[in-house]
Amino acid sequence: MQPDFLILGCLLCIVLVLQILALLRRSDHTALDHVLREEHRVGRAELREQLETLERQQEVRLASFARSLTDLVARIDQRLDQLTASLGEDARKGRQEASEGQQRFADALGQRLTELTQRNAQSINEMRTTLEQQLHVLRADNAQQLEQIRAIVDEKLQTTLNTRLDSSFKLVSERLEQVQRGLGEMQQLATGVGDLKRVLTHVKSRGTWGEVQLDNILDQTLTQEQYARGVRVCPDASEIVDFAVRLPGRGQYEAPVWLPIDVKCPKEDYERLLDAQEQADQELVRTMGVQLERAIKIQAKSIRDKYIVPPHTTDFAVMFLPTEGLYAETIRRPGLADVLQREYRVVVAGPTTVTALLNSLQMGFRTLAIEQRSSEVWSLLGAVKSEFGKFAGILEKAEKQINTVGKSLGEAGRKTRTIERRLRGVESLSQEQTQVLLDGLDVDAAESDVDSDASF
């Protein structure tokens, strides 16, 4: 609305200016004043009317805008109510569908388990029925063969009867042996399953199973001299740790220092935690997690109080958890591993990490062995140095002797060349003449030897 006011104001100013200019041209000032007053009054009246008109228009527009705004707010409220109702209905339907889906899944799972149980029972019944039928057929077959044997006894000779009897009894024994073998395998399988169940449910058996597992790992990683089973780490106490790694003392003849490794398996607390996680009950999961932490801390405190006795042992011990799941859950608990190391001086290890720990100890053993053998190597090098000095003296003597022999050979060579120079003027004999002459010299030498012997 402001541009309209500006335009009207400009027009009024222009009209006033034109009227003033027109009146200035007149010579009568009184008439000019009268005209100016009249024009000014008329202009003010027109301006007032225009302002009132604009005010009325503005009020009409504001009223229309207020009505439009009220309608818009009402429509928005209505749409919001509809949207809220629609979202609530969708959420209710979603919850209902999720509940129905979970119920269907639970029903399907229960039905599946029921079918599986019925199928297993049916399979067992079928196996029992088949076995009974085979035994019945076997009995009938045996009875039939016995009847045939009785009939043949009357018809055949004793030798034929014996042959048939041997054959029949052999067949019967083989089949009975097969049946007995099958029953024995089934009984052995059932016994093995029962033993495994007792091992996994009985606390002492679980400990024995963990000890066997740790024993296998130690046997594959270290030598028999580097660890021991059932070690009494403190001579003044009766506590015996499951396993201990033998660390060498500071001196060569000092007693070894033991690194205790004890097997712990709080399986019940861990299984209760797994059941709570499967039920998706956060409060129960938290409670079972706290119980598992408490059980681990109790075992760590027991290890600290029983097996950590410096200087007979190291100032820490190793708690071996025989399953990777239990070890991972223990490490996953916030701050539990730090508390065990700081307060109880216990390091938690699983089947994989204990292997890495033992490998690092094995490298330490090798380094220590190299350090211990370095003095022996140094002594051996000293002995080699002494012998090498003697060998150097022998080489010097040999060199002198070789030089002496070389000088003798050189002197002989010079004398030989001197004799050759002096004999250059002597005529050489043929090979036959030389041989005859040498033979004659040999005969003369032999005769002279005989004469000398005779004279004696």
From Swiss-Prot:
Transmembrane segments: none annotated. InterPro entries: DNA_recombination_RmuC (IPR003798). Belongs to the RmuC family. One of its GO terms (biological process) is DNA recombination. The keyword Coiled coil applies. Residues 36-60, 106-158 form a coiled coil. This is DNA recombination protein RmuC homolog. Signal peptide: none annotated. Involved in DNA recombination. The lineage of its organism: Bacteria, Pseudomonadati, Pseudomonadota, Gammaproteobacteria, Lysobacterales. Keywords: Coiled coil, DNA recombination.
